[in-house]
Amino acid sequence: MPVKEKVGVVISNKMQKTVVVKVESRYPHPIYSKTMIKTRKYLAHDEMSECNIGDQVLVQECRPLSKKKRWSVARIISRSSLIT
């Protein structure tokens, strides 16, 4: 079974070895055909705590690491220009 992957933006890194990643998905409205944007937040494991707010990351599904954490940061796609 292939591993699920999602691309998102880090919105919080205040926890130890954990980041909050915002993932946007676009889909057409079934009646009006307008493109809708659905946003979902995932807790992802960041072993080295190297992600910063605004970084674009690739997250992969993994085994449950805690009550809400089932994703891990696979790689950082692009770094943010924000200095934190």
Swiss-Prot record:
GO MF terms held by the record: rRNA binding; structural constituent of ribosome
Chain ranges passing through the membrane: none
Subcellular location: Plastid, Chloroplast
Keyword Nucleotide-binding: no
Functional note: One of the primary rRNA binding proteins, it binds specifically to the 5'-end of 16S ribosomal RNA.
Subunit structure of this chain's protein: Part of the 30S ribosomal subunit.
Family note: Belongs to the universal ribosomal protein uS17 family.
Entry protein name: Small ribosomal subunit protein uS17c
Record gene name: rps17
